């Protein structure tokens, strides 16, 4: 009887205090996909705003602001490789928008917390 009561009590305690384990690290594939998503968003915003007739400086500040706003609260931000992000943005701008003279140093303003 005592044994059954002890088994029931321990089983109950294990079920109550069982906490799921979540990984702190994210896979490289997830981080790479997130970086590509950011670069596509920035590139599309910049392309659309320049095609709409906004100046290059205005398009740049608008694109940086919109991208920062959209991605500022993501947990993956601390894992972003900014060099890879900048290269992806430049490649997207060259391939999709035919913009070859984009000032790379301006991408330093694209930073997430």
Where are these regions (language model features)?
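Classical Sec-dependent N-terminal signal peptides that target proteins to the secretory pathway
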Residues: 1-23
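Low-complexity, intrinsically disordered short peptide segments enriched in small/polar/basic residues
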Residues: 4, 11-14, 28, 51, ...
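Alpha-helical interaction segments
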Residues: 4-7, 16, 36, 86-88, ...
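Sparse, context-dependent recognition of short Cys/His-centered cofactor- or disulfide-binding micro-motifs
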Residues: 8, 31-32, 78, 82
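Short N-proximal segments of mature Sec-exported proteins
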Residues: 24-75, 95
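Compact alpha-helical subdomains of small soluble proteins
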Residues: 57-113
């Amino acid at each position: 009887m005592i044994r059954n009561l002890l088994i029931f009590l321990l089983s109950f305690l294990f079920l109550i205090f069982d906490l799921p384990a979540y990984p702190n690290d994210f896979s490289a594939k997830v981080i790479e996909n997130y970086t590509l998503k950011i670069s596509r968003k920035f590139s599309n915003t910049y392309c659309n705003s320049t095609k709409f007739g906004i100046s290059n400086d205005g398009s740049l500040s608008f694109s940086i602001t919109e991208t920062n706003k959209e991605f500022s609260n993501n947990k993956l931000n601390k894992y972003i490789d900014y060099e890879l992000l900048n290269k992806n943005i430049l490649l997207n701008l060259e391939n999709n928008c035919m913009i070859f003279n984009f000032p790379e140093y301006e991408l330093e303003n694209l930073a997430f917390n």
